[in-house]
Amino acid sequence: MDGIIEQKSVLVHSKISDAGKRNGLINTRNFMAESRDGLVSVYPAPQYQSHRLVASAAPGSLEGGRSEPVQQLLDPNTLQQSVESHYRPNIILYSDGVLRSWGDGVATDCCETTFIEDRSPTKDSLEYPDGKFIDLSGDDIKIHTLSYDVEEEEELQELESDYSSDTESEDNFLMMPPRDHLGLSVFSMLCCFWPLGIAAFYLSHETNKAVAKGDFHQASTSSRRALFLAVLSITIGTGIYVGVAVALIAYLSKNNHL
């Protein structure tokens, strides 16, 4: 029975050792030796004695095995790998000894990146996609400019002022009350064709009433009708006067011949 327990413990310790080598974790077997007082470090250098770590008692043994305390010693070679596994892949930590050994024996496996700032294109050069530069002289540089005459700007301002004045005059004309043409209506009624003159006079009064009420649309309509009738009355009256005069002259001339 003791032989079976020892074989199982040896297998367990070998598996732990192999797992430590594969995963880069702490090796607890290769650098310790058993003695009467327990596990003792086999490092000859005194500075590694401070790396000794005393673990707590084991929770249980395989099938009723031993329960004595176990001392674990950190392996400096695998400690760096275990630390690196907690960082991202782009962060690599190396000791000074490893870097020094790289500089001495493995210098050919390293690559160096150099940043050159002298190839930046100047103001008189142009960079092509293939990395070549070409110098540009003052004659080759073309600067697109935009110019205009001051007179054009003045003409534009004049046009804007004329347009604004026209719009203001139109607004003022629309806001002005329509005229009644009362005098022209009275003249057409008394001196010209009086039926149309009377109608023009009536429409002029309707225009004044619409303006007093604030109905500018009706007032403008009445004003246009009064003006039309007054002009028509004057035209007809003038024609009548001319016809009467011609008839009178013809009559008088006929009597003289007799």
Curated annotation (Swiss-Prot):
GO molecular function: glutamate receptor binding; protein homodimerization activity
Keyword check for Disulfide bond: no
Keywords: Cell membrane, Cell projection, Endosome, Membrane, Phosphoprotein, Postsynaptic cell membrane, Signal-anchor, Synapse, Transmembrane, Transmembrane helix
Phosphoserine modified-residue sites: 137
Intramembrane region(s): 229-249
A biological process term (GO) from this entry: positive regulation of synapse assembly
Entry's Gene Ontology cellular component terms: cell body; dendritic shaft; dendritic spine; early endosome membrane; excitatory synapse; glutamatergic synapse; plasma membrane; postsynaptic density
Extracellular side: 203-228, 250-258
Keyword Translocase (UniProt): no
Expression (tissue specificity): Brain-specific. Expressed in Purkinje neurons in cerebellum. Also detected in the hippocampus. Found at excitatory synapses and postsynaptic cells.
Highest rank taxon of the organism: Eukaryota
Ranges annotated as spanning the membrane: 182-202
Topology in membrane: Single-pass type II membrane protein
Function in brief: May regulate AMPA receptor content at nascent synapses, and have a role in postsynaptic development and maturation.
PANTHER family tied to this protein: SYNAPSE DIFFERENTIATION-INDUCING GENE PROTEIN 1, UPF0338 PROTEIN
Binding partners and assembly: Homodimer. Interacts with GRIA1 and GRIA2.
Protein family (similarity comment): Belongs to the CD225/Dispanin family.
Protein name (record): Synapse differentiation-inducing gene protein 1
